[in-house]
């Protein structure tokens, strides 16, 4: 259990995960092949959390700031053979029973959840996504679509690349954006992916030939 996810793991019926490097899977190949090799392990995590793999929602992740509505928006088949919502770098939903996932290897991933409702989200916020304030956009979409109050949200930033291993401190910018969006409960893993390769994949340190960590959020309907 990652300590930085603890604030989210206190929410009943919410499930979260962050799958780090899988040591026995060689990933010094191109992205699609690395993801193919990691897929059985990632699928097992989704199912271990109580979700059907047929209810697994992913974003295409194009380093932008568009947000998809999981369970509503249409999907396409990605290069790795699994469905994604095209053109988006974030997913939000209020539907229970869906598993949302984002892949990262230095970029930031942001978990969002409202303990007073079933509203949740997962965002890919690297240099470009942070510049475009994907977090602020996600909060506005939650307000518009679900009536979410920003002050009720819990936001968590996972491990990501940070100075001195990267010249842009986008983690600090994300913290500022959370405050500006009205988020009062913000938590940062304060961990650099490039400084701990036994635990994390790092696109920069491994020159692009590496795997991806998988972040997950979803809500299990009460029995």
Model-derived features: positions:
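Active-site microenvironment for binding and transforming phosphate-containing groups
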Residues: 1-223
């Amino acid at each position: 259990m990652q300590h930085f996810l603890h604030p989210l793991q206190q929410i009943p019926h919410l499930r979260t995960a962050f799958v780090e490097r899988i040591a026995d899977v060689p990933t010094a190949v191109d992205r699609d092949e690395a993801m193919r090799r990691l897929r059985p392990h990632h699928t097992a995590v989704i199912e271990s959390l109580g979700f059907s793999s047929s209810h697994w929602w992913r974003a295409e992740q194009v380093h932008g700031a568009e947000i998809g509505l999981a369970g509503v928006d249409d999907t396409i088949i990605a290069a790795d053979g699994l469905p994604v919502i095209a053109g988006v770098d974030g997913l939000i939903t209020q539907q229970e029973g869906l598993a949302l996932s984002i892949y990262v290897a230095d970029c930031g991933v942001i978990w969002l959840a409202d303990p007073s409702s079933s509203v949740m989200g997962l965002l890919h916020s690297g240099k470009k996504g942070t510049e475009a304030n994907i977090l602020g956009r996600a909060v506005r979409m939650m307000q518009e679509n679900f009536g979410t109050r920003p002050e009720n949200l819990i936001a968590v930033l996972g491990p990501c690349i940070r100075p001195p291993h990267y010249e842009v401190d986008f983690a600090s910018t994300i913290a500022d954006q959370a405050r500006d969006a009205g988020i009062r409960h913000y938590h940062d893993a304060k961990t650099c992916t490039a400084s701990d390769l036994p635990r994390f994949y790092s696109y920069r340190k491994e020159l692009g030939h590496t795997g991806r960590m998988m972040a997950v959020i979803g809500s299990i309907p009460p029995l």
